[in-house]
Amino acid sequence: MQTPQIIWSLIAPQYRGLANKVNRKLIQSSIKHYFWYCKQFDKLVHPFYYLTAKKHTPLFNQQLVDLAQSTLYFYNLSVFVDKSNAGQIIKNVTGSVEPNQITVIFGPSGSGKTTLIKQLGLVENPTCGFLNCGNFYYFANQKHNRATKQFQNSIGYVLQKAEEQFLCDSVLEEVLTGAINLGLCQKGDVNFAKKYLEMCGLHHIPLIKNPLELSGGQKKRLALASVLAMQVQFLILDEPTVGLDQEGKALKSALLKQLKQVTRIMIVSHDVDFIYETADSLIQLEAGQIVDQMSVADFFNNMQLLQRYEITPPLVVQTIQLLQAKGVQLNDPLAIKTVHDLIDQLKPLFHDQ
């Protein structure tokens, strides 16, 4: 692992002199000394903490800007089972999550997918490495400060089992609680709640109903509505299609594609058909390491990659391959994401006959 370096192009001009000094310190620090800094003095609160340790106030992260439209970078992230650095779960991964895109973390069970998204959302703290988004930097083992809290408030996390994040006894309270805590609405604001319930297809649900009495699909949509009500800039969903029928998956896909216009979205999923229809980019994990990062279309149309990872192609990709093997020439195969897209490209062929 290399010691982290501050990305020069992301530093405002007035801070570049400070950044240069910090980079020199990081270059001179061995890995052993780097961890010693983290564990003994906990001085890596942000890139410039070296220079402000006595004041305990950040010079750079006082007010976060451009989170929604900035790429989220992660560098050399590692996660160990315990403080003795035994049992490495995530192994020095580096990558990025682009704004206005849906990025999927993909890989076999036990590869570290859920662990990775928890680090990126700061639900859990990485053992080493750092995150950067806009003018926000977060180093492993640092103390949480105002900037960290602001970044965390910009993130919405929807668990695989939605009921595990329910806190209230009614649908109305469940949607409003997080937004009230952030000062976005008042208690009992029915119109505010209805806006997000309608967005998630729950306009017909009684507001006084207990969330635990909803169906599995409705619970997932309610959990999403409560997160969206907090007006997050980064949405993380763990296995969003588990327990959903085809109609529910189609609704979820359409909603996420609409939401990506105003936020970045990261999902963990094994559902190749949903991924192919919905996501833009893919990060492939194997045994805690990133082995590929590319567009979803390129990944699922690369038969060598799919064979290497023993992945069954999405149904629509299999259908396209069968048609092409029969000599059917499609206008733009990579643009076909759903059966409806395929039918639209096949219609002119039948009309020509």
Swiss-Prot record:
Disulphide connectivity of cysteines: none
Cited Pfam families: ABC_tran
Binding site for ATP: 107-114
Keywords: ATP-binding, Nucleotide-binding, Transport
Matching SUPFAM superfamilies: P-loop containing nucleoside triphosphate hydrolases
Superkingdom, taxonomy of origin: Bacteria
CC annotations in GO: ATP-binding cassette (ABC) transporter complex
Any one GO molecular function term: ATPase-coupled transmembrane transporter activity
Transmembrane segments: none
CDD domains given in the database record: ABC_cobalt_CbiO_domain1
Coiled-coil boundaries: none
Limits of the ABC transporter domain: 72-312
Keyword Nucleotide-binding: yes
Keyword Magnesium attached: no
PROSITE patterns membership: ABC_TRANSPORTER_1, ABC_TRANSPORTER_2
PANTHER family: ENERGY-COUPLING FACTOR TRANSPORTER ATP-BINDING PROTEIN ECFA1 (PTHR43553:SF24), HEAVY METAL TRANSPORTER (PTHR43553)
Family: Belongs to the ABC transporter superfamily.
Name of the protein: Putative ABC transporter ATP-binding protein MG303 homolog
Organism expressing this protein natively: Mycoplasma pneumoniae (strain ATCC 29342 / M129 / Subtype 1) (Mycoplasmoides pneumoniae)
Phylogenetic classification of the source organism: Bacteria, Bacillati, Mycoplasmatota, Mycoplasmoidales, Mycoplasmoidaceae
